From Swiss-Prot:
Gene Ontology MF term list: 3'-5' exonuclease activity; DNA-directed DNA polymerase activity; nucleic acid binding
Protein name: Error-prone DNA polymerase
Matching InterPro entries: DNA_pol3_alpha_NTPase_dom, DNA_pol3_finger, DnaE2, DnaE2/DnaE/PolC, DNAPol_HHH, NA-bd_OB-fold, NA-bd_OB_tRNA, PHP_dom
Species per Swiss-Prot/TrEMBL record: Brucella melitensis biotype 1 (strain ATCC 23456 / CCUG 17765 / NCTC 10094 / 16M)
Nucleotidyltransferase recorded as keyword: yes
BP terms from Gene Ontology: DNA repair; DNA replication
Record key words, sorted: Cytoplasm, DNA damage, DNA repair, DNA replication, DNA-directed DNA polymerase, Nucleotidyltransferase, Transferase
HAMAP family reported in the protein's UniProt record: DNApol_error_prone (MF_01902)
SMART domains: POLIIIAc
Reaction equations catalysed: DNA(n) + a 2'-deoxyribonucleoside 5'-triphosphate = DNA(n+1) + diphosphate
NCBIfam families with a match to the protein in the record: polc, PRK05672.1
Length: 1077
């Protein structure tokens, strides 16, 4: 068979152009018996690692080759060309070339290249030039110039596009080649692996050009021929040019480069003179141990672990990595920025002694090998959380410390999800915006999987319409396609040498940031280390709470400011509060599911919080581990350990793994260790399982390990049900699960935030509000909860408020919470500073304020709309009227005082009082909360006449009782582990109620569940032994329109369309729900 290499294959990382994944191209090329394939995406290397990972499995079985290249497009008229680096040095130059083009482009994501950029590098590449589709007078001269710049390295690409004039076109291209003295090379200029993808490629093209498939005309491919073709077909097509087929082998002959050649070198850290990195790390660790335990009181167990960890770190030469993270954390603490490591790093006593993590792994009995293992041969991965408001300071420190050409953020691939896929496909197929929106709103979830005909019909559309059917089919295929690259939340890659010779770097949309083209899975594949500089809103909240306590209660805690390490431990009152499910705002345990779990688990110590954090996750739930654990914890069933047959091992071989969780695996590490102990996985197989688990949601690869693990356990005598549950748990962790070390780090913050809520509720509420946006709840819910805990909350006021929410001493209570100007939507911090700066004397009237301040009319209107003039004895309506009478912003300064004086003498108009409901609506619209009431209380009379109960009545209702309730939807949840069950949380003036909707009810009332803001529910009370209450829905009704009756304002200001829903923190009168899938 004649060898043929396809050297111009574009994947879907040629964004909105290629219509196949890199993996699909590699797999299909091998299946068609091609000798090799070159992945060459347009001005990017973003997809090459995925192609490389797919190829690694194939190459073990054959001589099939993969080539890493790029299709270069120029802005100066230079023809497109695919270039392939011959060796590692050439690859580095290709990366730098693309980096230069990305930084030159003014728009993020673009790459502006000119011929001069390639000219001095051209000799290092194999180059195939693509002729223009139509005659260009200067092409022959440009081709000659390119050939002279890289003699012997340039080919002219020849395609057979099946467009009726292939023969004449080929003759023209052959003449160009002869004139320039370059050979022809055959290619199909591939855009997809199979012709079935042509319709999707049409959609991508239309989307790229912001048009429809029907209007795109010549922008679309003329046929479906640009797919991978077998060698015999390419030989037939190029029968008149056999030398072009043979040239593909000549083209690839000098290319030796593979991504395997990338060798990572971690940057050397500055160390004190006379020391090595190993010695410096050794000294820092033992100094930290002395601080934690006392110089002469370090427990022998800790000493042994430190020595063991330091020895392995030295063996693997990871000292610079630990010194880097230590340096970043130390810098943050010197700046007063709270931080804490999490994830697998919490397994390390070295990280604990360096102050990187806050959990003592010896007290929780965590496993260091989960963090670093010589067998895995993978770099460690330390995640550190910083205050979300100050994380950028830390990131810029990293850039300054390592320079822009040696440090960059990892990429995140923004991929199509179900709704975005349907929207783009719908637009491309010419569907109207309302039809596309209706179709998108029938989808629940992030990864799709089809749309039920009934759901399409419920959206008012015809499921038999061929365009609707086509849109759904294409959208399903499009799900998971990359749309563009963005920056990771904080993962940095740092290198000793130039990073832009390993991977291209481009500017991020955010100022002073840059990121590479590979995501976290890609860098794992090629062995690059990263440091995660992450943000966590709760750390911001805790730091602000510590500041408030020190400011207002300096006599407490010995006058010292609290820290993450100094806060009192083992406080019974904190655990008693959590056992009641009283956890609104508390880190990680504030969701409805966690609130329900707390009374059932009844945490009494720190490790219980570790379990609490981890147990409400798909892993334990899908593995059917939650209920057995709770029954054993409560003494309802004995704590037995699964065991193998006597001939295969001791009965207690899982004791060390499952002993502390009562014989039930709850953590990711336990499932992994069971695979090794019970199924006898080798370390390599266990590592494959771990990697499959990490990429399950994206790649769906974990099922390949299922039979091996289950059969391995059953063959050794374990119960099949237990084995299947263990693997289901692993699949659940692939969806979303916590390793024990991660749960332990988060449990530390659970306790601290719960302690603040328990002992300083006014401080905690103020800190939560001042740290927005963060967390699960909207300001209205935070304030309601604070008032239920005895906190006095005072409104925003021009004479008393600051930008932040503050604590204010009042005659009747020690400390009240005063709402700040930050609660007023649209009111700027600059206007706040002006207002406060001139407040040495109280403001007496609005005219007085206007005379003293340089605030524009808009600022005064916002203050009036927020009812912030209470201390002036002016209500909202009077204030709005007074603001309208103020001089225009253009009034000359010379006349301001005179105008104000004249206006002040004008008699006041007697205005009708605003209804209380109008005040509440205006409060929600301006500050997202109201101290005057809840929208539902003004509908209560009518609801009560219909027999509708309050949420409080539902909470107090007897098990099995049928009730009606109505409330504003605050949360919608359809967990993947719940087998189609949907959960709603609704709220009225008395509190919240939890609603359960079974699949058969969801099927009937899907539209109401997905779009209602105010919902009426009939159902039956379900009360557990621990007092957890749900209303199991039987009938639902959308009552959103009822809110219009509360105000004369325009309806669109009250009822936002469901497709405009955002985060629940941004709720107004009709709160936008938070939807989980």
């Amino acid at each position: 068979m004649v060898p043929y290499f396809e050297m111009a294959a574009a994947s879907n990382f040629s964004f909105l152009c290629g219509a196949s994944h890199p993996q699909e191209l590699v797999e299909r090329a091998h299946a068609l018996d091609l000798s090799g394939i070159g992945i060459a995406d347009r001005n990017t290397l973003a997809g090459v690692v995925r192609a490389h990972a797919q190829w690694k499995d194939i190459r073990k079985e054959s001589g099939f080759r993969l080539f890493i290249g790029c299709r270069l497009s120029f802005i100066d008229g230079t023809p497109d060309m695919v270039v392939y680096p011959r060796d590692r040095a050439a690859y580095g130059q290709l990366c730098r070339l693309l980096t230069e083009g990305k930084h030159r482009a003014a728009i993020k994501g673009e790459c502006h290249l000119e011929w001069a950029d390639l000219l001095f590098r051209a000799r290092q590449f194999q180059i195939a030039v693509f002729p223009p589709d139509e005659d260009e007078p200067d092409f022959a001269a440009r081709l000659t110039e390119i050939a002279q710049a890289a003699p012997g390295s340039v080919w002219l690409a020849l395609t057979m596009p099946h467009q009726g004039q292939d023969g004449r076109r080929a003759e023209r291209i052959a003449r160009f080649a002869a004139q320039a003295g370059v050979p022809l090379i055959a290619t199909n200029d591939v855009l997809y692996h199979h012709p079935d993808r042509r319709p999707l490629q049409d959609v991508l093209t239309a989307t790229r050009h912001h048009t429809t498939v029907f209007a795109a005309g010549r922008l679309l491919e003329k046929n479906a021929e640009r797919h991978l073709k077998p060698p015999h077909e390419m030989v037939r097509l190029f029968r008149d040019y056999p030398e072009a087929i043979a040239a593909t082998a000549d083209f690839v002959a000098p290319i030796t480069f593979q991504l395997d050649e990338l060798k990572y070198a971690y940057p050397d850290e500055p160390i004190p003179p006379g020391k090595t990195a190993q010695q410096h790390l050794y000294d820092l660790v033992w100094e930290g141990a002395a601080r934690h335990y006392g110089a002469d009181m370090i427990p022998p167990k800790v000493q042994g672990l430190i020595n063991k960890e330091l020895a392995l770190i030295a063996r693997l030469e990871y000292e610079p990595y630990f010194l880097t993270v230590y340096d970043i954390v130390t810098h943050a603490r010197e700046k007063g920025i709270l931080c804490q490591g999490r994830g697998s790093a919490a397994n390390s006593v070295v990280c604990f002694c360096l102050g990187i993590t806050g959990v003592n792994p010896t007290q929780v009995d965590l496993l260091f090998e989960r963090f670093i293992s010589a067998e895995r041969k993978e770099p460690p991965d330390i995640d550190v959380d910083f205050e979300h408001e100050r994380r950028e300071e830390v990131m810029q420190y990293v850039y300054d410390r390592y320079s822009r050409d040696r440090a960059a953020i990892v990429a995140t691939v923004i991929s199509y999800r179900s709704r975005s896929a349907i929207r783009d496909v719908g637009k491309a197929l010419g569907l109207s915006e309302d039809v596309t929106a209706a179709l998108a709103n029938t989808v629940w979830g992030l990864s799709g999987g089809g749309i039920d005909r009934q759901h399409i019909r419920q959206a008012g559309l015809d499921p038999d319409n061929p365009i609707i059917q086509r849109a759904v089919e294409l959208a399903i295929t499009l799900i998971g396609f990359p749309r563009h690259l963005s920056q990771h939340v904080g993962g940095f890659v740092l290198t000793r040498d130039r990073l832009d010779e390993t991977v291209p770097i481009g500017p991020a949309a955010m100022d002073k940031r840059s990121f590479i083209e590979w995501d976290k899975d890609d860098i794992d594949e090629v062995g690059l280390m990263k440091v995660d500089v992450l943000s966590l809103g709760m750390l911001t909240c805790i730091r602000k709470a510590f500041d408030l306590i020190h400011q207002h209660k300096p006599q407490l805690y010995g006058g010292e400011k609290l820290t993450l390490a100094s806060l009192p431990r083992k406080d019974k009152a904190v655990y008693d509060m959590l056992c009641k499910g009283d956890s609104l705002g508390v880190f990680q345990v504030e969701s409805r599911a966690q609130m329900n779990m707390l009374p059932r688990l009844r945490p009494q110590e720190f490790y219980d919080l570790v379990i609490e954090v981890a147990i409400v996750r798909p892993g334990p739930i899908q593995g059917d581990m939650v209920h057995p654990y709770l029954r054993r914890r409560s003494g309802q069933e004995p704590c037995t350990l699964p065991s193998p047959s006597p001939q295969h091992g001791p009965a207690n071989e899982l004791q060390q793994i499952l002993g502390k969780t009562k014989g039930v695996p709850l953590f990711q590490e336990q499932a992994m260790r069971i695979a090794m102990e019970a199924a006898k996985f080798t370390p390599e197989e266990a590592n494959q399982l771990r990697r499959a688990m990490a990429t399950f949601r994206k790649m769906g690869t974990i099922h390949t390990m299922e039979k091996k693990m289950i059969d391995g356990m059953v063959n050794r005598g374990y119960d099949r049900t237990f084995a299947e549950n263990c693997f289901n748990q692993i699949k659940g962790f692939g969806e979303y699960g916590f390793p024990e070390s991660h749960a332990a780090s988060f449990a530390h913050l659970v306790y601290i935030s719960a302690w603040l809520k328990c002992h300083h509720p006014e401080v905690f509420a103020a800190a939560l509000l001042n740290s927005q946006p963060m967390g699960f709840y909207a300001p209205a819910q935070i304030v309601r909860d604070a008032r239920e805990h005895g906190v006095t909350v005072l409104p925003v006021d021009v004479n008393f408020s600051q930008w932040d929410n503050i604590l204010e001493e009042t005659p009747d209570v020690h400390l009240a919470l005063r709402l700040g100007f930050r609660q007023i939507d649209g009111f700027s911090k600059r206007d706040t500073e002006l207002l406060i700066a001139d407040r040495q004397e109280p403001y007496r009237t609005i005219e007085d304020m206007h005379r003293r301040l340089r605030l524009d009319r808009r600022a005064f209107t916002l203050l009036a709309d927020a009812d912030a003039f209470g201390s002036l004895d002016i209500d909202r309506r009077a204030a709005l009227w007074a603001v309208r009478r103020l001089p225009n912003d253009e009034t000359l300064l010379l006349f301001r005082a005179a105008a104000a004086s004249e206006l002040a003498q004008e008699p006041r108009t007697k205005l009708p009082e605003m209804a209380a409901s109008e005040h509440v609506i205006a409060d929600y619209e301006t500050t997202r909360l109201s101290l005057k009431g809840h929208p539902l209380q003004y509908l209560r009379e009518g609801l009560a006449a219909e027999g509708v109960s309050t949420c409080r009545a539902v909470q107090e209702g007897a098990d099995g009782r049928r009730m009606k309730v109505a409330g504003v939807v605050t949360v919608r949840q359809r967990p993947g582990s719940a087998k189609g069950v949907v959960f709603l949380t609704i709220e009225d003036e008395t509190g919240i109620a939890n609603i359960v909707i079974w699949p058969k009810i969801m099927k009937v009332f899907r539209r109401e569940v997905m779009s209602a803001r105010l919902i009426h529910i009939e159902g039956r009370i379900q009360r557990s032994l621990e007092g957890v209450v749900h209303l199991v829905a039987a009938k639902l009704q959308d009552r959103s329109a009822a809110l219009i009756e509360m105000s004369g304002r325009e309806a669109q200001r009250l009822i936002a369309p469901s497709q405009m829903a955002h985060h629940p923190r941004n709720v107004r009168v009709m709160p936008n729900s938070r939807d989980f899938h």
